[in-house]
Design a protein with these regions (language model features):
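Solvent-exposed, non-membrane alpha-helical residues enriched in polar/charged side chains
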Residues: 7, 11, 41, 45-48, ...
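N-terminal binding-site loop/beta-alpha segment at the start of enzyme catalytic domains
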Residues: 1-18
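Beta/alpha (TIM)-barrel catalytic core signal, keyed to glycine-rich beta->alpha loops juxtaposed to Asp/Glu
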Residues: 9, 64-252
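Active-site-proximal beta-strand/loop segments in catalytic clefts of secreted hydrolases
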Residues: 23-25, 146-147
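Active-site groove signature of glycoside hydrolases
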Residues: 48-67
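Active-site mouth loops of central-metabolism enzymes
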Residues: 24-41, 67-71
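Short acidic capping loops at alpha-helix termini that bridge into adjacent secondary structure
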Residues: 15-18, 22, 54-58, 90-91, ...
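Short, acidic/polar
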Residues: 35-52, 97-104
Length: 252
């Protein structure tokens, strides 16, 4: 649905003004694993049709689940490289929740961009060696879940319950009153520290991730105009001092 919405924009916004990323490997289709070449092509062609474009800018391997013996790895990489050779994508990316998994495959995939899980509470970017690899190879880096599904913003006052199928239902921290109280306290501290910024809480949470990532960006889910306008005010990396201070709030 999101791709279809984006595909309606090209009469008003030039396609070349927008950098589009999509992914393959997010559903198995009729197969018993994530990276069957035929279904990767089905997903790729569906995305191009939805987006009303002949080529995306970036196409990710959505995760590093290539089979217990990595038996689907070669086909996955060969297929996405074929898409690139066919002019269906300009760049190739690799993503996973685990930076350790990314590190296990990064040299063999040889991606242009990495998309790891990272926020100021859950951060293995440096400790796994991913940061050093990204810098040594001048890769793009796009961090996902930067506000941990909203939990880090301090907007929750008590344990939350979610409907079946909502991913947040699997995040145990939403049931931790002590942690929720800490997030509320941290929210107040961010508002005080960055009072001169129009989005003080988001500035602290999001822009701290850019302090040590000069080739980086942060992926924020945006469901309404207000969230888009807030996101547009972010993206300036914190100073080392401010970044260390923010990280100390959530790791202390």
């Amino acid at each position: 649905r999101s791709e279809q919405i984006i595909g309606t924009m090209w009469d008003e916004i030039p396609r070349n003004d927008i950098f589009i990323a999509t992914k393959v490997g997010w559903d198995m289709g009729p197969h018993n694993h994530w990276y069957h070449p035929e279904h990767m092509r089905v997903n790729m062609e569906r995305s191009l049709k939805n987006l009303k474009t002949d080529c995306v800018d970036l196409m990710y391997l959505h995760h590093c689940n290539f089979g217990k013996q990595e038996q689907y790895f070669d086909d996955a990489v060969e297929t996405i490289r074929r898409f690139q050779a066919e002019g269906k994508t300009r760049f190739i990316g690799l993503s996973d929740w685990s930076s350790d998994k990314v590190m296990n495959f990064i040299e063999r995939v040889d991606p242009d961009v990495i998309q790891p899980y990272r926020n100021v509470m859950d951060d293995t970017y440096a400790s796994t060696g991913l940061k050093d690899y990204v810098e040594a190879n001048n890769l793009g880096i796009c961090f996902f879940s930067p506000i941990k599904h909203g939990l880090l913003t301090g907007k929750y006052t008590e344990p939350a319950t979610f409907e079946t199928g909502d991913f947040r239902k699997t995040v145990k921290d939403f049931a931790d009153q002590k942690l929720i109280d800490k997030m509320k306290t941290n929210k107040s501290k961010l508002e005080e520290r960055f009072a001169n910024h129009p989005q003080p809480v988001m500035h602290g949470l999001v822009d701290a991730l850019l302090t040590d990532a000069p080739t980086g960006c942060v992926l924020l889910g945006q469901r309404n105009v207000e969230q888009v306008e807030a996101a547009a005010q972010l993206g300036e990396a914190l100073s080392n001092e401010d970044g260390d201070w923010v990280n100390g709030l959530y790791k202390g």
